[in-house]
From Swiss-Prot:
Species lineage: Bacteria, Pseudomonadati, Pseudomonadota, Alphaproteobacteria, Rhodospirillales
EC class name: oxidoreductase
SUPFAM superfamilies: FMN-linked oxidoreductases
The name this protein goes by in its record: Dihydroorotate dehydrogenase (quinone)
Recorded catalytic activity of this chain's protein: (S)-dihydroorotate + a quinone = orotate + a quinol
Subunit structure: Monomer.
């Protein structure tokens, strides 16, 4: 934990979590969150989808829902930033309280419900000032929309020209019926319409189209998603969103709250999903690993399991912005210790040599 963040932690804990989040956005907007001036180790550099990433560590969607502070987030040292989830129309989300810290478990439960200012506000912001790093935009549907694919088409039409990659989010547990879109038939239809919308919006060089999936998938579900992804024109998968499962190990007061659980308890399951989907796709589809990553050891484990890139979010709540640099330094050391000259060389290494990882992996979670 950065010294200033450690000192501020008692004050942060005393604030309502959503209030603390708004203050964090404000601090970033004012340039008060700091700047990582250290150059990234060259071993961390990645190339994917024709884009260059200075390092593979990104910020997951959900933090900067409206694209207000992307440049300030790049200043913290992230290799890429994913904003959103954004919907075609502004919406308030679910009633408060809807965000809960599980401090003893190093976890968070949220039932935000895609609260955001809408795609027009985000587009206007990025037209005025395009963020200087690799930018992902995470797309969702409005709660009251019956034609879900129509909302994703609208988001693609408006925001595709402004993004380095787009994400179709059908895995949040906080929008009724959304996860049903992960089934083989509805997903195939959705991806076909999204791809057509993307081709129309960017007839030349189009941004990659990714799908964000849930951790609460059966082996059959994952096989279906892999088949659709490979045959339906997706450029990658993000694994995983929050879980509706509640491991018996949770001890925090808010463990029984409704919503999606993120953070440390999700670590093993999210890694397991990455490994499974890497195997099902035979490494042919880039994967972004997210869920329970809070240190360099797990970042490295996720890459060895099959992730080309990784993302964090919940761990920042407990560790602060200094975590970004710590993960990158540790990851670089682990790559070199195992003889890898690049991140790309390590992707999926456990499928080739499951006993070759340096360091000790996190224990298996009961989730």
């Amino acid at each position: 934990m950065a010294d200033w963040y450690r000192l501020a932690w008692p004050l942060i804990c005393g604030l309502d979590p959503e209030r603390a989040h708004h203050l964090a956005i404000r601090a970033l907007a004012l340039g008060l969150a700091g700047h990582d001036r250290a150059a990234d180790d060259p071993v961390l550099a990645c190339s994917l989808w024709g884009r260059r990433f200075a390092n593979p560590l990104g910020l997951a969607a959900g933090f900067d829902k409206n694209g207000e502070v992307a440049d300030a987030l790049f200043d913290l040292g992230f290799g890429f930033v994913e904003v959103g989830t954004v919907t075609p129309r502004p919406q308030a989300g679910n009633p408060r309280p809807r965000l809960f810290r599980l401090t003893q478990d190093r976890a968070v439960i949220n039932r935000m419900g895609f609260n955001n200012q809408g795609m027009e506000a985000m587009a206007a912001r990025f037209v005025r000032a395009r963020p200087r790093g690799v930018l992902g935009i995470n797309l969702g549907k409005n709660k009251t929309t019956e034609d879900a694919a129509g909302d994703y088409e609208a988001g693609i039409a408006k925001l595709a020209p402004l993004a380095d990659y787009l994400v179709i989010n059908v895995s949040s547990p906080n929008t009724p019926g959304l996860r049903a879109l992960q089934g083989r038939e509805p997903l195939s239809l959705l991806i076909a319409r999204a791809r057509a919308a993307l081709d129309a919006a960017c007839p030349g060089l189009r941004p990659p189209l990714l799908l964000k999936v849930a951790p609460d998938l059966t082996d059959e579900d994952m096989a279906d998603i892999a088949e659709v992804a490979l045959g339906g024109g997706l450029d990658g998968l993000i694994c995983t969103n929050t879980t509706i499962a509640r491991p018996k190990s949770l001890v925090s007061d808010h463990a029984g709250e409704t919503g999606g659980l993120s953070g440390l308890p999700l670590r093993y399951r999210a890694r397991q999903v990455i490994a499974r989907l890497y195997g099902l796709t035979k490494g042919a589809l880039p994967l972004i690993g997210v869920g329970g990553i809070g240190d360099g050891a797990e970042a490295y484990a996720r890459i060895r399991a099959g992730a080309s890139l990784i993302q964090i979010y919940s761990a920042l709540v407990y560790e602060g912005p200094g975590l970004v640099g710590r993960i990158k330094r540790d990851l670089a050391q682990r790559l070199r210790a195992d003889g890898f000259a690049s991140v790309a060389e390590a992707v999926g290494a456990d499928h080739r040599d499951p006993k070759g990882a340096s360091g000790k992996l996190a224990p298996r979670s009961p989730l």
